Amino acid sequence: MLPRPIFSRPAWAFAAVFMVAASLPSVSLAAGMSPAQIAAEQRRAGPDIIESSLTTRLDVASRAALITNVDSGEVLYSKNVHQRLPIASITKLMTAMVVLDAKQPMNELVTITEGDIDHLRHTHSRLTVGTKLPRADLLLLALMSSENRAASALIRNYPGGLNAGIAAMNRKARSLGMPNTRFFDGTGLHGENVSTPGELTKMVQAAYRYPDIRAFSTAPDYTVTVRGQEQHFRNTNGLVKKPEWEIDISKTGFINEAGRCLVMMAHIRDMPVVIVLMDSWGKYTRIGDANRVKDWLEVAINSR
């Protein structure tokens, strides 16, 4: 059995203030406004693109986006923030939370079975049927490398079985104030796993409370032994290896219906921010958008 992974940068080294608000309107909107008044203000601001008092303009290619200051709750930028979209493997953050909530032994061996094979999209996996790995390793691979069979095995082995695990995911979403979020599986391969940028921001902030999710989702790589052979896995978000980025939590996602998605909590010039990018097309668009957000915030913070 492999030991629990230890990473050079302790993910718990950063303090955070969680402000999971009931909603995420721009700070330019007055508190207590009716939905109709808020919609009118948003129309005047443009096509559901709202920016804070930051003076420079940001343009992202992603279909929907939300950038939030964690400490203050300020919405720094939003685009189509209320649009309900498929979330692909961003789902795995919720899978991880309910698995950890269940407090099952993390060193317990879990077996990959025929039931974990992806017959919907026929995605490839190096975790062959019969592979046995500690629950901790499966959780790491699901978060770091977006390993679908790992996520499937985790939720299938949830107390009470698969249906109980998916029900727990939906209950957790409701408890976090995410009424527009729905889960039908634990991998994100199901096209009807949906959410909004605002609700994914809440999910990222909730996931940050779990040290294992912080550590595993930002691990650059990890090696496991599968049937006597070493298999090396890498993080699906290459930014975690970039020294100019200080990323506290990360998850990527992709299916055709969702496009390419990316959620992160990061420190930019010592400001903790949640970055949600949904429905990016092109292999590098979400990474380009994330770098544009970082550059924009650095300029804006320096000019304050």
Model-found features: residue ranges?
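N-terminal secretory targeting signals
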Residues: 1-64, 295, 299-304
